[in-house]
Amino acid sequence: MPRIMIKGGVWRNTEDEILKAAVMKYGKNQWSRIASLLHRKSAKQCKARWYEWLDPSIKKTEWSREEEEKLLHLAKLMPTQWRTIAPIIGRTAAQCLEHYEFLLDKTAQRDNEEETTDDPRKLKPGEIDPNPETKPARPDPIDMDEDELEMLSEARARLANTQGKKAKRKAREKQLEEARRLAALQKRRELRAAGIEIQKKRKKKRGVDYNAEIPFEKKPALGFYDTSEENYQALDADFRKLRQQDLDGELRSEKEGRDRKKDKQHLKRKKESDLPSAILQTSGVSEFTKKRSKLVLPAPQISDAELQEVVKVGQASEVARQTAEESGITNSASSTLLSEYNVTNNSIALRTPRTPASQDRILQEAQNLMALTNVDTPLKGGLNTPLHESDFSGVTPQRQVVQTPNTVLSTPFRTPSNGAEGLTPRSGTTPKPVTNATPGRTPLRDKLNINPEDGMADYSDPSYVKQMERESREHLRLGLLGLPAPKNDFEIVLPENAEKELEEREMDDTYIEDAADVDARKQAIRDAERVKEMKRMHKAVQKDLPRPSEVNETILRPLNVEPPLTDLQKSEELIKKEMITMLHYDLLHHPYEPSGNKKGKNVGFATNNSEHITYLEHSPYEKFSKEDLKKAQDVLVQEMEVVKQGMSHGELSSEAYNQVWEECYSQVLYLPAQSRYTRANLASKKDRIESLEKRLEINRGHMTTEAKRAAKMEKKMKILLGGYQSRAMGLLKQLNDLWDQIEQAHLELRTFEELKKHEDSAIPRRLECLKEDVQRQQEREKELQQRYADLLMEKETLQAKF
């Protein structure tokens, strides 16, 4: 018998990826074509997998309490209508059905007093999942079967093929349609040029023609309006919000990971905080009870007789206060002694609100649904199934309504309104934190300081506020009067740089400079010092000109020669000696490195530092100040002017200077083998050839460098000016086309003008010819009419005879 392949089973990660790629290519309507890529799945299973698991809009986070309440209420209202319930909750129908059954099974386990730690919907070993499309994919094995590898390669090849037969046919049809449109357009143009107008028949659209009309157009009213607010004001761009992660937005994987982390923390807190339910599950007691301890109160600190005495004293003080008010006595002494103590302050300390009694609505609804599911037939009669009282408040999330308190009903002997949950507190009644104090009644005024000040302040009473201001003012005045007189006079003398130091200290106190600004300022100081130091060097170091790698000390003449040296020769020897010292110093501190070579690769310019150090120890290098160098420069300039006037030298032109430079430069030849320069007339033919080869190589290197630089600049200019060039080419082409049209129109105009001239000259002749033809025709008609009349008379005559 042939092998029968039954499609279905657990979904693998490879199949999920193929399904997602196929949906991206073929869409969500060609499930048969998508299923042809998956050998073990049918089209119906692929569609169910997409709409039940792979769709990005599916919510896979943990169920919240509001969603569970809404699910149970909607299941009661619309039983078995999961496709209708799913979009209301925001889940899929399979998720709603699965969680509904999970809640019912969990309730049944709790009623049967079974263990509820495990998931009741979890599959047992050997069972087959009836809905594998709603479960996570199984990871791919390391060693895949040949069938799976073949399926994967086939799917990869088919999905990568974007130019199939249908795509080519569509492209061909599109080209034919474009050709037909262009042909019809050309035909209409030719007919219009010939003077034949053809109205294009347009199909009447049923709705709005968006090519002819402007939908929802609202024309502006007539009149002048102020348009100053329409000016665009450029905002400062916040480049911190233009990063790539801000532009891309939050990824779906990051959002789901954050939701999963929240779910884990929620479960952990639920296990830690729901201790009574855990005790109930382990002990089996249906109701959590706790034995209350005996109430122990402290002994009374005042007897009834003492309380009566306090009441009598209060009544007496009240009578005295009223008498003083009626008599008009309002001085500070009487107001202090006769203060009011029988009115309770409105600022009552905040009492801890009682936790409102609540019930587990999810458990009640699940029990009601189970009771309705297991009810017997109503034909037996009897009482109805007992159910818990419930309403439809669980369909929407519950929220507490904020109410404004009623100030009329807030009396001292009622429940404090500022402690009620969800009510707006009144001004002046915000309680102050009082440690180790029982909230209760507090006197409104306490002029004799009997009670602490924390619980007696009532800022809503204007008289109390004024009294406090007067007392504070009086206390401040007495304190200032009690200050001792000054004993000594002091005079403070600030140093010279005190203001600058104070300004720097204030700047340091008020403003903390950024580390980058500090580094930039230090770098600027170092650069300035480097530039200042560089100005003290000679021109060869400042301009980074080539310098000799070795110092030739043989140019010095011996001092003890016969005949002895003249003063001019001695001066020249001093200049040579100073030049040699400067060369040793520069080779030690500022060695020359050609720009074409890297550090450490200059073999020809390597120097012996010990030799330079030894020479500088015998002949130290002396550094001069800027003023000394300026004086020496001025002396040289003066001497040059004297020599120029004495020798009658004029200004040297650039052509003469270049000629002398070329002649001098042609006499010097560089020997690459010896890494030195020599005179050209002293070099051999081989040395000249090597020198020319070296110069050719250097020139080729320069040419290559310049070519690369030119190519880079050309590429940059092409990027910058490519759009302008293409635009210029397009405009030039349009200009040429317009010029051709102008020439063609001018030619046609001249042709029609010549034709008009010929027609104007030929029209009179044609008119004469036509007139002659008409005249001849009239004469012939006249002759024929006359002949007809004669023949008619002859006929009548003959008839009369016979």
Swiss-Prot record:
Primary role: DNA-binding protein involved in cell cycle control. May act as a transcription activator. Plays a role in pre-mRNA splicing as core component of precatalytic, catalytic and postcatalytic spliceosomal complexes. Component of the PRP19-CDC5L complex that forms an integral part of the spliceosome and is required for activating pre-mRNA splicing. The PRP19-CDC5L complex may also play a role in the response to DNA damage (DDR). As a component of the minor spliceosome, involved in the splicing of U12-type introns in pre-mRNAs.
Pfam family membership, one: Myb_Cef
Region of interest (Required for interaction with CTNNBL1), ranges: 200-206
Name listed for the protein in its UniProt record: Cell division cycle 5-like protein
Site of covalent link Glycyl lysine isopeptide (Lys-Gly) (interchain with G-Cter in SUMO2): K135, K219, K487
Polar residues composition-biased segments: 408-418, 426-439
SMART domains tied to this protein: SANT
All copies of domain HTH myb-type, residue ranges: 1-56, 57-108
PANTHER family, A to Z: CELL DIVISION CYCLE 5-LIKE PROTEIN
Gene Ontology biological process terms, A to Z: cellular response to fibroblast growth factor stimulus; cellular response to interleukin-2; cellular response to nerve growth factor stimulus; cellular response to prolactin; cellular response to wortmannin; DNA damage checkpoint signaling; DNA repair; G2/M transition of mitotic cell cycle
GO CC terms in record: catalytic step 2 spliceosome; cytoplasm; DNA replication factor A complex; nuclear speck; nucleus; perinuclear region of cytoplasm; protein-DNA complex; Prp19 complex
Underlying gene: Cdc5l
Maturation and modification: Phosphorylated on serine and threonine residues. Phosphorylation on Thr-411 and Thr-438 is required for CDC5L-mediated mRNA splicing. Has no effect on subcellular location nor on homodimerization. Phosphorylated in vitro by CDK2. Phosphorylation enhances interaction with PPP1R8.
One Gene Ontology term of the molecular function aspect: DNA-binding transcription activator activity, RNA polymerase II-specific
